Amino acid sequence: MEMARISQIAAALACCALALPAAAQSSRVEKTQAEIALEQAKTTFATQKKARDDANAACAARDYEACVKAGDSYRKGMGGMQDYALALKAYDRACTGQNGKGCASLAYLNMLGRGTDKNLAEARRLYKQSCDYGEVSGCAGYGNMVYTGTGGPKNVTEGTNKLRDACERDYKWACDRLVDLGAFDPNDSAFERLKDYR
């Protein structure tokens, strides 16, 4: 009888143990895809806001690479509202600190007229300054503007050379642009005959 009672108790405990996970599952609330997406967006925004705040603080302390990051966050609207005026200020501070990326980003906004009046001559000057600081994207932008005569005199040879240099530094846009423009090798004699034709 004692053995039967132990068996009954063991069976009752086993039933209770099995019932607990089933009860816990039935009371668990699943999240919808929208709720999951909202949580992820809030987390991403908080991370981006902190990155923007950190970049602004470092920019104020004359970390010019951080100024570029702050400018990017304002231009793209990451970590807060999109604000081209603040992006321009951050990029200008970076460019003034001789950061080539800052000058190239400032040139891009001037070229498009975002946060400022469209000014192609200023964009060209800033792309050249960026290139002079060693920024490959600035060299590509400057080369493109010189090749096409945008914002200043056209010079196919100089433009081709700048684009080719940027392409050789693995800047894909410059390589694609050379193909799009049908740019010839400036050292090729056929190029000399055709350079004024374009």
Predicted regions and their residues:
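Terminal, low-structured helical/coil segments at or just beyond the last alpha-helical repeat
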Residues: 29-30, 165, 169-198
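Bacterial N-terminal signal peptides that target proteins for export
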Residues: 2-10
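N-terminal signal peptide c-region/cleavage motif recognized by signal peptidases
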Residues: 19-21
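N-terminal leader/linker segments that initiate helical-solenoid repeat arrays
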Residues: 23-69
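Short helix-capping/linker turns of helical repeat alpha-solenoids
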Residues: 61-64, 76-78, 96-100, 112-114, ...
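Hydrophobic face of amphipathic alpha-helices that form TPR/SEL1-like repeat modules
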Residues: 37, 69-76, 90, 105-112, ...
